[in-house]
Amino acid sequence: MSAAIYLVKGREKSVVRRHPWIFSRGIDRVEGNPQLGETVDVYGHDGKWLAKAAYSPESQIRARVWSFEKQDINRAFFVKRIQDAQLLREDVIERDGLTGYRLIAAESDGMPGVTIDRYQNFFVCQLLSAGAEHQKQNIVDALIEVFPDCNVYERSDVSVRKKEGLQETTGVLHGEMPPKSVVIEENGVKISVDIVGGHKTGFYLDQRDSRQQAMKYVKDKEVLNCFSYTGGFGLYALKGGAKRVINADVSQPALDTAKFNAELNEFDISKKRAVFLNADVFKLLREYRDQGTKFDVVIMDPPKFAESKAQLNGACRGYKDINMLAFEILKSGGTLLTYSCSGLMDLALFQKIIADAAVDAGRTVKFVERFEQAADHPVDTAYPEGFYLKGFACKVI
């Protein structure tokens, strides 16, 4: 008989509504001796069977639901999940001409703790939960069955694994080692991705729609692209006809790739058109403000400021500071394109921070457009936490 967990009376409601997380305080008792990541049956207080879940004894999220149906969690299970995810994305893959996209968006694709990004024929896995680690071989075997010619590389070098009792790890799981540069295409733009050494799994695929939408604000404009990384927004700004784009980032290797990406797309990167500036964005914004330097468009896409609730207040101050500075260096009629990828910061809070930043900058500002993560990053209706990326276009009057 498999191990099982029984829920505290009244705590069945979220599982019945198909939320995939079961917290430690919601568990009344554990039967058997489930090991790290092992699949357990989930029962209500009344003994009614509810779900199959992965057990994680060291995490506050004590179990993550694989399925609300009575089925084995094996290779065939993951084959079906991956096939369903690929089918869900077929339209956007064709529409946007994608050779790089998110194949599996963790809980939102019924695979909690599992992220899989595809770059050409390289599939990059992040396994962030005990259950995902326990099922690693089944997941890899399922990928091989669905995509026979695939190469699979693991980028589980993420600190959140420690909360699950896991060590950070990377390496080839199947096939070849990724080369230094894998070139993908989206919306007709070519982008070089460093799978092994880049941020996350190599690139920020979730901002694809925002990059495309940014193009309508940049024609014949002076653009400052903050936290530019490998130049994603800057590439779209050049494609959109920007007069000049300054890409600012603290990482010289990222800026070198940004320049390479511009050359890859055969954009004009003379100093009159494109600049790749190694700088601390916070200091740079203050320097521009103090010098009286102004821009038509500022793009503000910072890294995640809040990894935990304890960091949220500090993150709010950081977001407010950079957006206030951005408003201060915008010309009248200028546009701020600003984003937050911190899931702990909801849309209403982010909007309030931007509003407060406008007040502190002494500028009259209108919200004119809202942005969210790209369509290959879906949000399951039972899992609102899957909505994490938000952004605004703000017009300075």
Curated annotation (Swiss-Prot):
Q: Give the matching PROSITE patterns.
A: PUA
Its keywords, alphabetically, are:
Cytoplasm, Methyltransferase, RNA-binding, rRNA processing, S-adenosyl-L-methionine, Transferase
As one GO molecular function, the record gives: rRNA (cytosine) methyltransferase activity
- In terms of one coarse class, where is the protein primarily found? cytoplasm
Task: Determine if Transferase is one of this entry's keywords.
Answer: yes
Report the subcellular localization: Cytoplasm
Q: What is this protein called?
A: Ribosomal RNA large subunit methyltransferase I
